[in-house]
UniProtKB/Swiss-Prot annotation:
The modification Phosphothreonine is found at T1115. This is Synergin gamma. Residues 175-211, 578-600, 661-701, 730-753, 797-835, 856-922, 941-1042, 1088-1113 are annotated as: Disordered. Residues 614-878 are annotated as: Interaction with AP1G1. It comes from Rattus norvegicus (Rat). It comes from the Eukaryota. Residues 761-773 are annotated as: Interaction with AP1G1, AP1G2 and GGA1. The modification Phosphoserine is found at S571, S676, S815, S844, S864, S904, S944, S947, S997, S1021, S1088, S1090, S1102, S1113. Residues 112-152 form a coiled coil. It holds the Pfam family EH. Residues 197-209, 874-883 have a biased composition (Low complexity). Gene3D superfamilies: EF-hand.
């Protein structure tokens, strides 16, 4: 601490001291003291970490300690990847040379370099995709975040800040955006407090993550990112902490106060130093978070690390992750106490250092809070010292810069209004520009000084070359000012494009390194990374994450060293190293990170996500040293998970994996998917995963805008599955992680999982927050459902389940209970409850798996498929079941194992309820999932929009699957809120859950309080919950309807049992409807809507109609139409129901038509004066009105034919038809005054009747009248007859709409929607026809 020479230094010093307490002689230099060299300062920040851990320090110092870096694998890997994270960007690989100042390059073995380079390249490509995808996702995420904000205020706060501070950066930090989504994590945080220890660690991390998300703005804002570590605990506080006003210590203190630190955490805070005592809180909180959130916390921590990146945050993150993470991995799921203990140990050693770092960092960050991060901030604060000569040396400033300066200079300074169009002409996304601005604008907010302008232009130029400008320090890499390409200023040509681009590949990391400063900052200067590049932060964090992931390997070595030393200080140093390492990793992951970094806008989320993941990895390692048991456990969990399972490869794999996976948690977890590095390149390779994911995601996103948002976080990460992917990402992440290191990696997998989840939760968290909020361990607000679910499922870990625990609960459940599928089934909680929860969890896990599976199914990555498939089937289960990931995957897997297939995942959610069915469901699931994934994956998701839709999909599923689903349904309904997203995200899981959700809604909600919690719909009563879930009646009904259809086989029974089964006939009707709907509607909108709808549904369960309606907006007709019927006849079973349904629907239709016609008749009859009446009727409005009435009558005529065709007998229907004819005949008298009287032929639709032999009759049948949508009355009437009656011309008559798998006559659908109910009935043509 003594070394805190300055704010920047203090951050470094804090970090330095944090690790060793006194031993950390981190030079404040790191704080950004280092003047010009962003990297170096970062490194220095990292350096402090390095000091403690020289090997890592070298990495941190990267440049300074190239020797250290080369110290060994650690030095090599950790050094740059881990330690030099700051420089890591540079050391990325061989890229350290990019920085040139770093001899870190040697750190990586040629293979590593090669891998990194390749992965970097892939990442870069994927990131490019991600950027676009994430831009879209950002929009979605922003919307979702808004929803989320509604659901979770805290996240909202963070989001607001983030939005305000870095709306642009938001795009950049899409991952962060997701993190913001993850911000719900903050929402979760509140829950986390429930489980102070686990909760806490998770919370901190979560906040970190959230903050990371917010870090978009927060990181960029300042060290807040760091604060987020503690702050996230309380979103408000984090933001406060973000604010310089809130001293880090204070923030930490607040955090500590806000989220009681677990025993371990408390010690940590003390361990951290008095000053850091507060910080320790943060640290502790962080650690706690780490523990609690395990994966997410780690991820978030990583994110936090990235975010905070400042030594403090990084340290904290590291410490927390170290303590928390490690604890999390080993005990996160297993035992909060253990975690706590571990956390305590780790935290004590680690946190203390990190805390200090955080405190210092915080101060630093507070100082430079405006700036990216403390580290970055310091780097950035001393912008000029760090600025290359061509920025402050007038003689070296390019003419292009001067020209722009002259153009924008006014007497009052540089006119931002004039500069704006110039910057916009660079073609960079607003988020990227916002990020750059945030990084450069340090003097007067909103106004740039000359040097800042030059910095902005240079960073724009660098970014245009594909090298993310993590911080102004990056510019030090350029001997001459890079000239941006501005359409307005042709003179600016990016000459060095190729070089930077090259850098991007290799130097990408290095540039990030420069940026890397932030990256370094990420370590110590995490804030630099996080803050400096809050925009970058997301990026950077991701970067650090990446590196951290890599770091894991390196870190592991480092940690091992640290572990060997066994000194907590050392550990912390190690941990610090990890941050440094993280930076290094970042560097290392430069490959991944650079790519990540490069797609600053979109990458951020991924990056962040990954960052979190990485961070987790790194953290974990750091924790390793911190607590031997924990350390070993944690890191080993991680390490095991990664290095162990993927042990060796993981180092590389992790590096490359992370590197590759760095892009997003998903990649990460995808990587997990592709355990082998080979896979990582393909799948792991973000490019593949992300490419596919991105592409798929893009498709998905295209398909499913929501997906974009949800997936954005998740999707981008999970790219593979559209909706499912998001969840997959989060869950898959877990899963994949476990998958990746299945054997040993299991534990790590959970960490990874958690981490990924965190990261997913960060990224996915955003998504997860979107849906992850729901499904993800209750990522945050919505996460309540999940949290509840989690808590619910994790009765044992009820408190934790909330937010962190959600994951953790999930995790814990996975760990202890999840280890055995039983957990999922009921090991943890009450059979129903736990089963449910577990099921839910498993569903969630499975969902992840499913998502993953679906994801793999949907994902281009076959690897993922294979891996996950295995993982899904049983390999994952068996392998992962041991580890934390196992915990998660275990539940996941167990469910899977139970089911033996992806479906099994869902099946487990049924608890043991449909174990028998599970097997069949298994195959069916997988088959169906695959089928759906391929064909209806989207559909499934679409369906998943409403549980009813899912059931539909499942309806398509083989009945066996359906039945399994049925039981599962009960559970899923509850999870539906959580799983609504989940469902959305994972087609299979989703679909199963979805319909299961419906059932489960009923079942579960009735079953458990969890339902209430789960009831995102907020319907407390089971019935309500069911209804609320989808919409009370529609939702439940929809669900039921679909469910009944889906559980055609056993599920039907189950459904019936759940009183959700409609009628078999109905089921079949719906099923057939679904068949068309599934593919037609579900595929595109539903999936897109899926997340949104789900969110909506969950968010607004009360408006039953509205929700279904919303869903309906996507899968309106199917869901609405079928659900309505089902709704009504939900309790009915048998053939009668079908007929009754027709009678019921037509009765409503004719009743409404009678009202319309009668009103018209009464209105006209009410006009005493025939002259006035004639005038009214002949007026434009009168004619239009009567034309509408005529159309309504024509609908009744069509329905009448449908009634006759289906032989539906009902006195009420007959009476209604008679009444309508009476009123109509009366009304014709008035119409005779105009030319409106319809020709008899226009009312004769007998030619539209569908005969039994007609092919595709089901597709041609109108969902309202069951008549052929392609036939028109004009066939009966001659064209001549038609001509005078414009209302019935062939054009109008032929209008038909497709919705929910059904086609409708435009007039039928419009009448139904406007006069009967908002969702079309989706009646199926009876087979009897």
């Amino acid at each position: 601490m003594a070394l805190r020479p300055g704010a920047g230094a203090s951050g470094a010093a804090g970090a330095g001291t944090g690790p060793g307490g006194a031993g950390s002689f981190m030079f404040p230099v790191a704080g950004g003291m280092r003047p010009p060299q962003g990297l170096i300062p970062m490194q220095q920040q990292g350096f402090p970490m390095v000091s403690v851990m020289q090997p890592n320090m070298q990495g941190m110092m990267g440049m300074n300690y190239s020797s250290q870096m080369s110290q060994g694998p650690i030095a090599m890997q950790a050094g740059i990847p881990m330690g030099p994270m700051p420089a890591a960007g540079v050391p990325f690989l061989g890229q350290p040379p990019f920085l040139g100042m770093r001899p870190a390059a040697p750190q990586y073995t040629p293979d590593m370099q090669k891998q990194f380079a390749e992965e970097q390249q892939k990442r870069f490509e994927q990131q490019q995709k991600l950027l676009e995808e994430e831009r879209k996702r950002r929009q979605f995420e922003e919307q979702k975040q808004k929803l989320r904000l509604l659901s979770s205020v805290k996240p909202k706060t963070g989001e607001k800040n983030r939005d305000d501070a870095l709306e642009a950066i938001k795009g950049n930090l899409d991952g962060f955006s997701r993190d913001a989504k993850m911000h719900p994590t903050p929402a979760s945080h509140p829950k986390k407090p429930d489980c102070p220890t686990s909760s806490h660690s998770t919370k901190t991390v979560s906040p970190s993550s959230a903050f990371l998300g917010e870090d978009e703005f927060s990181g960029f804002m300042q060290g807040p990112v760091e604060l987020p570590t503690c702050g996230p605990s309380s979103t408000a506080q984090p933001f406060q902490s973000f604010l310089p006003s809130t001293p880090l210590g204070q923030l930490h203190t607040q955090k500590a106060g806000a989220q009681p630190l677990p025993p371990g955490q408390a010690p940590v805070s003390f361990a951290v130093h008095g000053v850091h005592g507060q910080i320790p809180c943060l640290s502790a909180a962080s650690a706690s978070h780490s523990m609690q959130k395990a994966g997410p916390s780690l991820e978030e921590k990583l994110l936090v690390s990235c975010d905070i990146s400042a030594s403090g945050q990084e340290h904290i993150k590291l410490s927390s992750p170290e303590a928390g993470h490690r604890a999390v991995v080993p005990g996160s799921s297993k035992n909060s106490p253990g975690l706590m203990a571990h956390n305590g140990g780790a935290v004590d050693g680690c946190v203390s250092g990190p805390t200090t770092a955080v405190a210092e960092k915080t101060s630093d960050q507070n100082l430079s809070k405006e700036e990216s991060g403390v580290g970055v901030f310091p780097s950035q604060d001393p912008v000029q010292p760090r600025m290359p000569p061509w920025i402050y040396n007038e003689s070296l400033v390019p003419d292009a810069y001067k020209k722009i300066l002259e153009t924008t200079m006014t007497p009052t300074g540089i006119d931002t209004a004039k500069l704006y169009p110039i910057l916009m002409s660079s073609g960079l996304p607003r988020e990227t520009l916002g990020q750059i601005w945030a990084l450069a604008n340090r003097t007067t907010p909103g106004k740039l000084t000359k040097e800042e302008l030059y910095t902005v232009l240079a960073m724009v130029a660098v970014t245009q070359r594909g090298v993310p400008a993590m911080s102004p320090d990056t510019l030090n890499q350029f001997p001459a000012a890079p000239i941006p390409t501005l359409s307005g200023f042709p003179m600016t040509l990016p000459t060095p494009v190729s070089q930077p681009t090259a850098m991007t590949s290799g130097p990408a990391g290095s540039i990030p390194l420069s940026l890397g400063q932030p990256i370094m900052g990420i370590n110590l200067v995490g804030p630099v990374g996080g803050a400096a590049a809050p925009t970058s932060s997301g990026f950077m964090p991701a970067y650090p994450s990446n590196q951290v992931g890599k770091t894991e390997e390196d870190d592991f070595q480092d940690f091992q060293d640290a572990s060997k030393s066994g000194s907590i200080d050392d550990s912390f140093t190690d941990f610090q190293e990890v941050p440094a390492s993280s930076k290094t990793s970042n560097s290392q992951h430069g490959n991944s990170a650079p790519s990540l970094l490069i797609p600053l806008p979109g990458t951020k989320a991924s990056t962040d996500k990954y960052a979190v993941f990485k961070g987790i990895s790194a953290e974990k390692p750091s924790e390793n040293p911190a607590s031997f048991g924990e350390s070993g456990d944690k890191y080993s969990a991680f390490r095991e998970l990664e290095p162990t399972a993927d042990s060796k490869p993981l180092g590389e794999s992790f590096a490359e994996f992370r590197s590759t996976g760095t892009d997003d948690g998903f990649t990460d977890f995808k990587t997990a998917d592709s355990v082998s590095p080979l896979e990582p390149p393909t799948k792991d390779s973000f490019p593949s995963a992300f490419a596919s994911g991105a592409a798929q995601q893009t498709q998905t996103q295209v398909k499913t805008p929501l997906n974009l948002a949800d997936l954005d976080m998740f999707s981008s990460v999970d790219c593979s599955g559209e909706k499912p992917v998001p969840f997959s990402a989060a869950f898959s992440t877990s899963k994949s992680v476990s998958s990746r290191p299945q054997p040993a990696g299991s534990a790590a997998a959970p960490a990874s999982l958690a981490s990924t989840k965190a990261s997913s939760l960060a990224d996915d968290f955003g998504e997860f927050n979107l849906f992850g909020e729901y499904s993800n361990p209750a990522s945050v607000g919505e996460q309540d459902d999940f949290a509840d679910f989690m808590a619910f499922g994790n009765s044992s870990i009820p408190s934790e389940p909330k937010a962190d625990d959600k994951y953790e609960a999930l995790r814990e459940e996975g760990s202890p209970g999840a280890l055995s599928t039983s957990t999922v089934e009921g090991a943890h909680n009450p059979p129903v409850s736990s089963s449910k929860y577990d099921v839910f969890k498993q569903l969630s896990l499975e969902g992840a798996g499913l998502a993953i599976e679906e994801f793999k199914e949907n994902t281009p990555s076959t690897k993922s498929d294979g891996d996950f498939a295995d993982f899904h089937s049983s390999k994952f289960s068996s392998t992962s079941s041991d580890k934390s990931l196992g915990e998660k995957a275990v539940a996941f897997r167990h469910a899977k194992e139970d089911s033996a297939s992806v479906k099994s995942l869902d099946l487990p959610s049924i608890g043991g309820s449909s174990v028998g069915k599970e097997d069949s469901e298994d195959a069916l699931s997988v088959q169906f999932d695959m089928k759906l994934a391929d064909v209806g994956g989207d559909l499934k998701h679409v369906m998943s929009d409403s549980s009813l839709d899912l059931p539909t999909v499942s309806g398509q599923h083989p009945p066996a699957a359906g039945s399994a689903l049925a039981s599962e349904d009960a559970l899923p309904e509850t999870p539906f809120p959580a799983f609504a997203s989940f469902k959305d995200m994972m087609p299979q899981t989703t679909e199963q859950k979805e319909y299961e959700s419906g059932d489960f809604q009923d079942f579960t909600r009735q079953d458990m309080p969890m339902v209430d919690r789960s009831q995102e719909n907020t319907c407390p009563s089971p019935a309500s919950s069911v209804a609320s879930h989808e919409t009370p009646k529609e939702g439940a009904d929809d669900f039921g309807e679909f469910q009944s259809e889906k559980p055609k086989i056993s599920k039907f029974d189950f459904l019936v049992a759940n009183s959700q089964s409609k009628m078999k006939s109905s089921e079949e009707m719906i099923k057939s409807e679904l068949a068309t709907f599934d593919l037609s509607v579900q595929g595109s909108h539903k999936r897109s809507l899926s997340l949104g709808d789900k969110e909506i549904s969950r968010s607004s369960p009360s408006p039953a109609l509205e929700q279904p309606f919303r869903d309906r907006s996507n899968t309106l007709s199917e869901r609405a139409a079928l659900p309505v019927i089902r709704d009504k006849y939900k309790d009915l079973t048998g053939e009668v129901e079908e007929n009754e349904r027709y009678a019921y629907e037509w009765q409503r239709c004719l009743g409404s038509a009678l009202d319309v016609i009668k009103k018209a008749n009464d209105t006209l009859n009410g006009i005493s004066s025939s002259a006035v009446c004639t005038e009214v009727i002949q007026s434009a409005q009168g004619m239009e009105y009567l034309l509408g009435v005529v159309e309504v009558y024509r609908v009744t005529k069509r329905v009448e034919l449908g009634i006759k065709a289906t032989a539906v007998c009902s006195e009420k229907l007959q009476q209604l038809l008679k009444d309508i004819d009476k009123v109509w005949n009366n009304l014709i008298g008035f119409m005779s005054l105009t030319t409106l009287t319809p020709d008899e032929n226009s009312l004769d639709f007998s030619s539209c009747m569908l005969r039994p032999g007609i092919k595709n009759a089901q597709e041609l049948a109108c969902g309202v009248c069951l008549l052929n949508v392609d036939s028109r009355s004009r066939k009966e009437e001659t064209p001549a007859e038609e001509q005078p009656k414009k209302a019935f011309n062939s054009e109008t008559d032929s209008f038909k709409l497709a919705y929910g798998g059904h086609q409708y006559h435009a007039s039928c659908a419009n009448f139904w929607i406007n006069c009967v109910e908002p969702k079309p009935p989706g009646l199926l043509l009876p087979d009897l026809l």
